[in-house]
Amino acid sequence: MSSLVSNEVYDVESGLRKVIESAKANFCESVDVAINLNINSSKSDEQVRGCVVLPKGLGREVRVAVFAKGGHLEMAREAMANIVGDEELIEEVKKKQCKLDVDWCLTTPDFMASVSSIAKILGPKGLMPNPKFNTVTFELAKAIKIIKSGQIRFKSDKTGIVHAKIGNVKFSIEDLLENFNAVINAVKQCKPASIKGLYFKDVFVISTMGKSVKVENLNN
């Protein structure tokens, strides 16, 4: 995380304005939220992970790959999946003949065993289909539509911080605020049962090249 903008704490709207004002890079910087959680990441039952649909999207195309067979392939194509394939695509991935330049990978339950053969490739990239994220489903068209509308995943890192994109510096403050609130609420819903007291320690907003800005703690 970048250095703080002094030790001041801003309301969320003012903090987002501060982030946009300080974004000086010659490219469109992303805007992220970083939530420092009161968890012990070494404990499996205190790791926080989930997904959320950003109501105002990401400001870019969300790319999806689908591994399936038979009629599900055509379903995925009609739903505008970016990459679609069966065992042949899996072999291309194994041989590094296909660059999976995507944000999400989906499959159907009956094809999951085949996709598991490339788990060591997809896993480190965070792309392995997971029923918890509804990326292992027969309802591919529905899942693709939801993901492309702006679904992101989040996961606490080894220091107990959740990082999530909420847009870019060209977004309006109102749109960034709506996405910010969606992420905050989603992380709250993933609060481990073992955490009885304080859950959020600190919350920051930050642009790609800018300084992080501390905003009001949103435990309530």
Swiss-Prot record:
Record InterPro entries: Ribosom_uL1_bac-type, Ribosomal_uL1, Ribosomal_uL1-like, Ribosomal_uL1/biogenesis, Ribosomal_uL1_3-a/b-sand, Ribosomal_uL1_CS
Gene Ontology, cellular component aspect: large ribosomal subunit
CDD domains membership: Ribosomal_L1
GO biological process: regulation of translation; translation
A Pfam match: Ribosomal_L1
Listed GO MF terms: rRNA binding; structural constituent of ribosome; tRNA binding
Statement: the UniProt record of this protein carries the keyword RNA-binding: yes
Keywords: Repressor, Ribonucleoprotein, Ribosomal protein, RNA-binding, rRNA-binding, Translation regulation, tRNA-binding
PANTHER family per UniProt: 54S RIBOSOMAL PROTEIN L1, MITOCHONDRIAL (PTHR36427), LARGE RIBOSOMAL SUBUNIT PROTEIN UL1M (PTHR36427:SF3)
Annotated function: Binds directly to 23S rRNA. The L1 stalk is quite mobile in the ribosome, and is involved in E site tRNA release.
Similarity comment text for this entry: Belongs to the universal ribosomal protein uL1 family.
NCBIfam families: rplA_bact
Subunit structure of this chain's protein: Part of the 50S ribosomal subunit.
Protein name as annotated: Large ribosomal subunit protein uL1
Species per Swiss-Prot/TrEMBL record: Ehrlichia canis (strain Jake)
